[in-house]
């Protein structure tokens, strides 16, 4: 039980580090896609290592979410877990599709990974919105902050699914996602596993 809490909270903190690294790496790479794939391969130790580390962090987060879903029989955590499972599919696509592959294959893997990641995050964030809508763990003001952040970011990813925003626009909401992950970490630390949230 404590392991699930540790996994959820620790991964929610660590993922902020990998998001920061990703934004930094994105700023260093070429803007033209073909040149970017070449740049990624030339610096594969950095990119591959980053994605492997993030993959492990996301696995930790997923384990925590699945445990909470089973422990509480919670719809919120079931939605969150489903989103995490979809997100996990992104990493094998990048790790297997980018390294030393022709541009056409790398581009296909990139489109698949991006689409999977966007849909996974949409489901994950909607699950968080549902969780914080009913949760009584936080004080009212923090609950409203969590609801606002999860609502805005969910809507942003929905706009990406529809096509009104692009994946490149996601950098704009990155600070909001960072803050939401920190709130998630606090939730994992504060919640008592003996409590049952049948209404979630």
Language-model region placement:
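Hydrophobic, aromatic-enriched alpha-helical segments typical of multi-pass transmembrane helices
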Residues: 1-200
